[in-house]
Amino acid sequence: MGKLVALTLLGACLALIGERLLNFRERVSTTREIKATEPQNCHLIEGLENGSEDIDILPSGLAFISTGLKYPGMPAFAPDKPGRIFLMDLNEQNPEAQALEISGGLDQESLNPHGISTFIDKDNTAYLYVVNHPNMDSTVEIFKFEEQQRSLIHLKTLKHELLKSVNDIVVLGPEQFYATRDHYFTSYFLVLLEMILDPHWTSVVFYSPKEVKVVAQGFSSANGITVSLDQKFVYVADVTAKNIHIMKKHDNWDLTPVKVIQLGTLVDNLTVDPATGDILAGCHPNPMKLLIYNPEDPPGSEVLRIQDSLSDKPRVSTLYANNGSVLQGSTVASVYHKRMLIGTIFHKALYCDL
């Protein structure tokens, strides 16, 4: 009898794992023909060769770019080099990327920047918040931006037990931000198991000096996050679920779901067009090529624009699409005055006029 029970349980477990493996394959093996779409006057940005995972642009047109991310399971073209933060001035006729010098107590050799977000205080001082993965841990680094010197001063490192496996961040006040956790576990084996079983345990965390709490959960893999222009709604990308969650922000910083927009492609980072309020999404149209990288058959890139996101019928259009021949593994697109920057996990970055 005992052996029969054991065999029954084993069979049930194997059946569950088999079903979950098929489900995982379905989620990440999207293979569809990419119809090339390119705005006028696009060119690769010189000096950005090792990824440009996230981009955030100040209202003045200064764009911060995080580069050199080393992420488990993803390719890295310069695995032994620390990450950098670059700056581009989109007011210039021919903007160029320059690496920002960093001063302060940060161990720059362990800089492994992921999501970034800017905040401007009442005296117009700009601060850059950076999700960092030193030795594959998760911290949030706070920098003060010195515009005249074009440099960053490291002010503080934030750590918390809820800030584990952090992917992206959106800052709404001094040391007040939402952060996404793309995995519940942190060990590589358990992360793989989590990806296969897909328990929907990832979440959005609110951080402040007085309170840190989970404000939304139940995502397959919470990824990019941003906020509407009026700061009433928070947009969360659920990458492997291929959708965007629109959440209402309350005075106590809690989030409640409003709607979900299905996109049919893996959604990475999100930004908002400051001129229109439209959501821009950096996407992965053929994600299996990210996991099994072949330079002869590279992953493509895709940027979607979502208009009227709160309406019954949001309008989704393609701003950029490429099969990987130009740009591989797009993660983010950010715009300023009809100029668009597109970043990638490990590849290059693209500038386009819209």
Curated annotation (Swiss-Prot):
One of its GO terms (biological process) is regulation of cellular response to drug. Keywords: Calcium, Disulfide bond, Glycoprotein, Hydrolase, Metal-binding, Phosphoprotein, Secreted, Signal. Glycans are attached at N50, N269, N323. It comes from the Eukaryota. Its cofactor is Ca(2+). The keyword Transferase does not apply. Pfam families: Arylesterase. GO terms for cellular component: extracellular region. Its EC number is 3.1.1.2, 3.1.1.81, 3.1.8.1. The modification Phosphoserine is found at S165. GO terms for molecular function: acyl-L-homoserine-lactone lactonohydrolase activity; aryldialkylphosphatase activity; arylesterase activity; metal ion binding; protein homodimerization activity. Ca(2+) 1 binds at E53, N167, N223, D268, N269. Has low activity towards the organophosphate paraxon and aromatic carboxylic acid esters. Rapidly hydrolyzes lactones such as statin prodrugs (e.g. lovastatin). Hydrolyzes aromatic lactones and 5- or 6-member ring lactones with aliphatic substituents but not simple lactones or those with polar substituents. Belongs to the paraoxonase family. Homodimer. This is Serum paraoxonase/lactonase 3. It comes from Mus musculus. The lineage of its organism: Eukaryota, Metazoa, Chordata, Craniata, Vertebrata. The gene is Pon3.
